[in-house]
Amino acid sequence: MKIEKYNLESSQVCIPIPENYKDCLTLIKSDRYRKTGKELSSMSVILNGLKHFNSDILFWFRLSQYKKGILWAICRLMYAHVSQRYQIQIPASTKIGYGLTLGHRTCMVINGGTIIGNNVNLSQFINIGTNHKTPAIIGDNVYIAPHVSIVEDVKINNNATIGAGSVVTRNVPENATVAGVPAKVLNYDNPARYILHRWETKEQ
């Protein structure tokens, strides 16, 4: 697994980039672990993904990140199909860390240049975009509630919580809970409280 590092305000976020299908399966395992708290075998991950082939968007997303061979073309087609079904626009080129959770799996638009860290929760009806500048960089252990919009060139630091309906126009400090239009810091109490079953990485 290749690791790319991106700067936040006071730390770095380390993003795994799969270099083979074994790496893709590790990423899928991390996503499953976030839901169940149990680390599954590679065979269990594959069988579960195929069993739910018409709905398992993260299974096809992770496999689409390794861009080689005939299998890649099949995975891209399946990912496009499932994405359209659930109205989720997350380009396969988007760099996302271990342990992604999609709440309710519906209606999300994320710019392909966005960087998303490890153990992040994305909820329904969120928009992370840009028109001209660099897209957002999101750190580790971040919870983004429903109906949140994050504008270009902001950094969401580690352990942040973004309340429902917020519009984020500036950097969010580490451990902060923010909400509102525009989003403002409410407190620094109990950071990352909604991030359950965290996948531990060597880089963390």
Which residue ranges define each predicted feature?
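Left-handed beta-helix
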Residues: 86, 91-92, 97-98, 103-112, ...
